[in-house]
A protein has these predicted regions:
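Active-site surface patch of divalent metal-dependent phosphodiester/phosphate bond hydrolases
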Residues: 128-146, 150
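Cap/insert and terminal regions of metallo-dependent hydrolase folds
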Residues: 91-99, 119-120, 124-133, 221-263
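A structural signal for short coil/turn segments at secondary-structure junctions
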Residues: 107, 142-144, 247
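Conserved beta-sheet core of the metallophosphoesterase superfamily
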Residues: 146-149, 163-169, 230-290
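Short C-terminal domain-edge/linker segments immediately following a structured domain
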Residues: 95-101, 143-145, 178-182, 214-220, ...
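Short beta->alpha connector loops
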Residues: 48, 70, 93-95, 129-133, ...
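N-terminal active-site segment of His-dependent metallophosphoesterases
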Residues: 3-135, 208-217, 222
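Conserved catalytic scaffold of divalent metal-dependent phosphoesterases
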Residues: 51-57, 64-75, 104-105, 118-123, ...
Length: 290
C-alpha cells in the first residue's frame, strides 16, 4: 500500500488522538453511475477508497469512515431490476464486503462521518439535483455503530430540510456537538452563499457557527463547505481558512469542493481532510492491509 507521509512542521500540531500521519493511494475504486447534463448522458465513474492512519483511536474503536459528495447511483446490473439506489445507500455494504476484511479490526467497532451531498436525481440527467438522503443515513446506521454528519446544500430529509428524526445511533450536526467513543465532533451544515437559499449562510454567519462549535473543544470539526488549501491549490473559502488558523488546531473533515490531494495542513497545524467524491477509512497506525 503506497502512502504519502505527512511532513512534520516546526509549529503547534494537533493534540489528542486524531492527527493523521499518512494516507494511502486508493486501495479500491468502486464503479458507479454519474449524472450527465441531459437524458442518456450518464456515465460510469469510480469512487476511490483510501486508508488514513492516525496516531491514536479510542480503545474499542477500530475505524472511522469519512465520505461526502457521493452524487451518483449504483449500476443497473447491481440493481437486479429494481430502481437504482443512491451510491451512499450501497457503499456501506460494499465496504463491508471488499475493504474492511483487509484491515485488522479486533473489535469491529466502526463509526461514520458524513460530510454532506448524497443525492442524485434518479434519471441521472441533471447535475446538482436536490433530494431526500434519509436512506443514505439509514443505510450507514444499520451497518455501523454510530454516525455523525452534516447536510450538504443538495440534501433534504423527507419533506424537511433537516432531519426531524434520525437513527438512534446518528447525530445530525449544525452548530451542535456530539460525543462518540470519547471523541467530540462538531459540525456546520450547508455552504457559503445566499442565505435565502437552501442550506446557505453568509460567510460571516458560517464563520460565527464555526467559532461557536470549536469553542466547545471539539476534536473533529465536520463541514460541508470549508477552507481552501493554497499550498496545494485546493478550492475553498479564504476567510474560513484564516479563521481556523486563529483557532486551536483540530481535524477538519469537509466536502463540497474536490481536491486532487485529500489532505492539507494549515499554518497552525489544523489538518483538513477532503472527502469530496472519495471515501477515507481512518485507522490506527498498527492496522495492516492484508
Amino acid at each position: 500500500m503506497k502512502k504519502c507521509a505527512i511532513p512534520n512542521r516546526a509549529i503547534t500540531v494537533l493534540t489528542g488522538s486524531m492527527k493523521i500521519t499518512s494516507i494511502s493511494q486508493p486501495i479500491v475504486e468502486f464503479p458507479f453511475l454519474n449524472a450527465g447534463k441531459r437524458v442518456g448522458d450518464f456515465y460510469v465513474d469510480r469512487l476511490p477508497v483510501h486508508i488514513a492512519t492516525v496516531e491514536h483511536l479510542p480503545d474499542g474503536l477500530d475505524a472511522i469512515i469519512a465520505t461526502a459528495d457521493l452524487q451518483g447511483r449504483e449500476r443497473f446490473q447491481e440493481a437486479n431490476g429494481h430502481p437504482i439506489r443512491l451510491l451512499g445507500e450501497v457503499l456501506p455494504q460494499k465496504l463491508i464486503d471488499e475493504v474492511i476484511p483487509k484491515l485488522q479490526m479486533p473489535t469491529g467497532r466502526i463509526g461514520v462521518v458524513l460530510a454532506g451531498d448524497f443525492y442524485t436525481v434518479p434519471a441521472l440527467n441533471k447535475r446538482g439535483g436536490t433530494g431526500d438522503v434519509s436512506e443514505v443515513w439509514q443505510s450507514f446506521a444499520r451497518q455501523y455503530d454510530w454516525i455523525v454528519g452534516v447536510a450538504g446544500n443538495h440534501d433534504t430529509f423527507g419533506d424537511q430540510p433537516s432531519p426531524t428524526y434520525s437513527p438512534t445511533n446518528a447525530s445530525f450536526l449544525d452548530t451542535q456537538t456530539a460525543v462518540h467513543d470519547t471523541i467530540r465532533f462538531g459540525g456546520v451544515s450547508g455552504i457559503i452563499g445566499n442565505p435565502n437559499r437552501h442550506w446557505r449562510s453568509t460567510v460571516e454567519q458560517y464563520c460565527e457557527k464555526i467559532e461557536q462549535v470549536v469553542s466547545e473543544k471539539t476534536d473533529v470539526l465536520v463541514l460541508h463547505d470549508g477552507p481552501d488549501a493554497p499550498d496545494s491549490g485546493g478550492k475553498g473559502n479564504v476567510m474560513v481558512r484564516e479563521l481556523l488558523e486563529l483557532l486551536p488546531p483540530t481535524l477538519v473533515i469537509r466536502g463540497h469542493a474536490h481536491w486532487k490531494s485529500p489532505l492539507a495542513e494549515l499554518d497552525n497545524g489544523t489538518q483538513v481532510l477532503n472527502v469530496d467524491a472519495r471515501c477515507v477509512l481512518l485507522v490506527r497506525e498498527t492496522a495492516a492491509v492484508n
